[in-house]
Regions:
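AAA+ P-loop NTPase nucleotide-binding core of proteostasis motors
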Residues: 1-237
Length: 237
């Protein structure tokens, strides 16, 4: 929320740095050097690097040194202020092996969102996916929210089966995006229930018959609202 932050961070600008742009080219080392030098001249700037573990093991042109090493001096002197994001697995596999790099950071564990929070995330992400794909989930917000709840509830089974590696909201977002992809491959400009069915089925954690049964229950529960929208209820193939 606005102003809901520590006073020490107020007034800072945050810039997201694309990890592939740093390590996916032959001049990644030069880009990092230019970035570090630029940060020395600026006050109250924080850079954010997602998938920061990818810098570990990405060699510089001078040898096997990780590109991550190029940030160490700036981090130690305070001229570089950096927030990095990664998963617990990647943190333990890559980041922890470089103790000097670890000492320059404070680890903050982000708790997995609840199912209710996950539904909110899906609802906020929907408009972006619609713009990106040109496909619409063409229902009222009430039905959209309940479709998101349905996806979250169904992916809870996926979470149970693959508990170690699967987390909210990623698994639910993946299913939502796959529903839009299924619509695109179906040459449809709108996401239908059959596309949601295909997306959930692709997880291979829920039997197709179970998905069909739950979709039938969903449609029955909201049949009046769907009828008002003129929705033609089709059976998944």
């Amino acid at each position: 929320q606005l102003n809901d932050m520590p006073n020490a961070l107020k007034g800072y600008s945050v810039y997201k740095i694309s990890t592939p742009s740093l390590i996916g080219t032959t001049d990644g080392e030069n880009k990092i050097m230019a970035l570090v030098n630029e940060l020395k001249t600026r006050d109250k700037v924080i850079i954010f690097i997602d998938e920061i573990h990818m810098l570990m093991g990405a060699s510089s042109s001078n040898g096997p040194m990780d590109l991550a090493n190029m940030f160490k001096e700036g981090l130690g002197r305070g001229t570089v202020k950096l927030i990095g994001a990664t998963t617990v697995d990647e943190y333990e596999r890559y980041i922890l092996r470089d103790k000097a790099f670890v000492r320059r950071f404070e680890r903050i564990d982000i708790l997995e969102p609840t199912q209710e929070m996950c539904v909110e995330i899906l609802m906020k992400t929907l408009p972006k996916i619609e713009v990106q794909t040109g496909v619409k989930l063409n229902y009222t917000d009430f039905i959209k929210e309940n479709i998101c709840k349905f996806i979250v509830n169904m992916t809870s089974e996926y979470k149970r089966v693959y508990e170690i590696s699967s987390r909210y909201p990623d698994i639910a977002l993946t299913v939502l995006r796959q529903a839009f992809s299924a619509a695109l491959f179906d040459n449809s400009m709108e996401v239908r229930f059959r596309h949601i069915y295909e997306a959930i089925k692709s997880t291979k954690a829920v039997y197709p018959d179970v998905i069909k049964k739950e979709l039938k229950v969903f449609k029955e529960e909201f049949k009046d609202e769907l009828a008002e929208e003129g929705v033609v209820v089709e059976k998944p193939q």
